[in-house]
Amino acid sequence: MTVIYLEKRFLKIIMGSQISFTAVGDIFMNRMLPEAGYEGLSELSELISSSEVRFANLETTIHDREGYPFPFSGGTWAMAHPSVLDDLKKYNFNLYNAANNHSMDYSHNG
């Protein structure tokens, strides 16, 4: 299932003639970032925040670590606790894709 969330203000932007768009590839994040962060992340956040549409492919499933990996999902089970979403908020993404090859790593409940 793909979930697309567009804020009302984007409808006005889309109806205009130009928008700025930043897209990043797979975010495969399975733990929170260190409190001090990493070198260069603040600059990356500024770059991402400079666009009106900020898209990321969330390659990791987000859940509370209950359940077991689905045995037929391919052997690489991507999972992160919901707390990693707090770190992702720092980068101001406003559009996520969650439909990918890891969507069923923990079956229907994951």
Q: Over which residues does each language-model region extend?
A:
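Acidic, metal/ion-coordinating pockets
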Residues: 2-110
